[in-house]
């Protein structure tokens, strides 16, 4: 989860988020190199005392500043396209979870099991336990197994929403009348927090998402208790 004064990305809890972290560092390195190079050239032009009689025309430098940015863009675009296609790929999911956005709460359906659906509301501050997280905890958490491919289907009943869990690298738009899907895998047990990331009305800030990832044997017990 996000913590106070956290300027970086959240710790990754899925292979997809790990790749997004690597891409962030890769892009930041390229941007740093560009900034240093441009700053150095500007400094040299401003503070040297040389006179260039051919400053208005230079075919070589024009070729360089046309070709070099194209090469740099390729180094950014190719990893980005790979990640975009990776996010859209569905790999034989073990479990399908359906999430429906409402004003202003989420409802969930485990479509692989009969009669397993519930609503998830934010716990108000005056009802929150001492060790709870303000504006993040919910009354019914989404429980998912660790190290299993999860497919999530996302839609909405009223206005646009967005189902987002940053530490998993997941962000899916919830659009009324449309079913969007995404595939992810959680590689460690724990609690993962997210929020609606599409402005959807007065209480947009008060519809959090909480995922609890547990081992498969505990997940089966939870499913059994919920369906009985």
From Swiss-Prot:
<dbReference type="InterPro" id="IPR045187">
    <property type="entry name" value="CcO_II"/>
</dbReference>
<keyword id="KW-0460">Magnesium</keyword>
<dbReference type="GO" id="GO:0005507">
    <property type="term" value="F:copper ion binding"/>
</dbReference>
<feature type="binding site">
    <location>
        <position position="196"/>
    </location>
    <ligand>
        <name>Cu cation A1</name>
    </ligand>
</feature>
<feature type="binding site">
    <location>
        <position position="196"/>
    </location>
    <ligand>
        <name>Cu cation A2</name>
    </ligand>
</feature>
<feature type="binding site">
    <location>
        <position position="200"/>
    </location>
    <ligand>
        <name>Cu cation A2</name>
    </ligand>
</feature>
<dbReference type="InterPro" id="IPR014222">
    <property type="entry name" value="Cyt_c_oxidase_su2"/>
</dbReference>
<keyword id="KW-0999">Mitochondrion inner membrane</keyword>
<feature type="topological domain" description="Mitochondrial intermembrane">
    <location>
        <begin position="82"/>
        <end position="228"/>
    </location>
</feature>
<keyword id="KW-1133">Transmembrane helix</keyword>
<dbReference type="GO" id="GO:0005743">
    <property type="term" value="C:mitochondrial inner membrane"/>
</dbReference>
<feature type="binding site">
    <location>
        <position position="161"/>
    </location>
    <ligand>
        <name>Cu cation A1</name>
    </ligand>
</feature>
<keyword id="KW-0813">Transport</keyword>
<dbReference type="Pfam" id="PF02790">
    <property type="entry name" value="COX2_TM"/>
</dbReference>
<dbReference type="GO" id="GO:0042773">
    <property type="term" value="P:ATP synthesis coupled electron transport"/>
</dbReference>
<dbReference type="InterPro" id="IPR008972">
    <property type="entry name" value="Cupredoxin"/>
</dbReference>
<comment type="subunit">
    <text>Component of the cytochrome c oxidase (complex IV, CIV), a multisubunit enzyme composed of a catalytic core of 3 subunits and several supernumerary subunits. The complex exists as a monomer or a dimer and forms supercomplexes (SCs) in the inner mitochondrial membrane with ubiquinol-cytochrome c oxidoreductase (cytochrome b-c1 complex, complex III, CIII).</text>
</comment>
<dbReference type="InterPro" id="IPR001505">
    <property type="entry name" value="Copper_CuA"/>
</dbReference>
<keyword id="KW-0249">Electron transport</keyword>
<feature type="binding site">
    <location>
        <position position="204"/>
    </location>
    <ligand>
        <name>Cu cation A2</name>
    </ligand>
</feature>
<feature type="binding site">
    <location>
        <position position="200"/>
    </location>
    <ligand>
        <name>Cu cation A1</name>
    </ligand>
</feature>
<feature type="topological domain" description="Mitochondrial matrix">
    <location>
        <begin position="48"/>
        <end position="60"/>
    </location>
</feature>
<keyword id="KW-0496">Mitochondrion</keyword>
<dbReference type="InterPro" id="IPR034210">
    <property type="entry name" value="CcO_II_C"/>
</dbReference>
<dbReference type="GO" id="GO:0004129">
    <property type="term" value="F:cytochrome-c oxidase activity"/>
</dbReference>
<keyword id="KW-0679">Respiratory chain</keyword>
<keyword id="KW-0472">Membrane</keyword>
<feature type="binding site">
    <location>
        <position position="198"/>
    </location>
    <ligand>
        <name>Mg(2+)</name>
    </ligand>
</feature>
<keyword id="KW-0186">Copper</keyword>
<feature type="transmembrane region" description="Helical">
    <location>
        <begin position="61"/>
        <end position="81"/>
    </location>
</feature>
<feature type="topological domain" description="Mitochondrial intermembrane">
    <location>
        <begin position="1"/>
        <end position="26"/>
    </location>
</feature>
<dbReference type="InterPro" id="IPR002429">
    <property type="entry name" value="CcO_II-like_C"/>
</dbReference>
<dbReference type="InterPro" id="IPR036257">
    <property type="entry name" value="Cyt_c_oxidase_su2_TM_sf"/>
</dbReference>
<keyword id="KW-1278">Translocase</keyword>
<feature type="binding site">
    <location>
        <position position="198"/>
    </location>
    <ligand>
        <name>Cu cation A2</name>
    </ligand>
</feature>
<comment type="similarity">
    <text>Belongs to the cytochrome c oxidase subunit 2 family.</text>
</comment>
<protein>
    <recommendedName>
        <fullName>Cytochrome c oxidase subunit 2</fullName>
        <ecNumber>7.1.1.9</ecNumber>
    </recommendedName>
</protein>
<dbReference type="InterPro" id="IPR011759">
    <property type="entry name" value="Cyt_c_oxidase_su2_TM_dom"/>
</dbReference>
<keyword id="KW-0479">Metal-binding</keyword>
<keyword id="KW-0812">Transmembrane</keyword>
<feature type="binding site">
    <location>
        <position position="207"/>
    </location>
    <ligand>
        <name>Cu cation A1</name>
    </ligand>
</feature>
<dbReference type="Pfam" id="PF00116">
    <property type="entry name" value="COX2"/>
</dbReference>
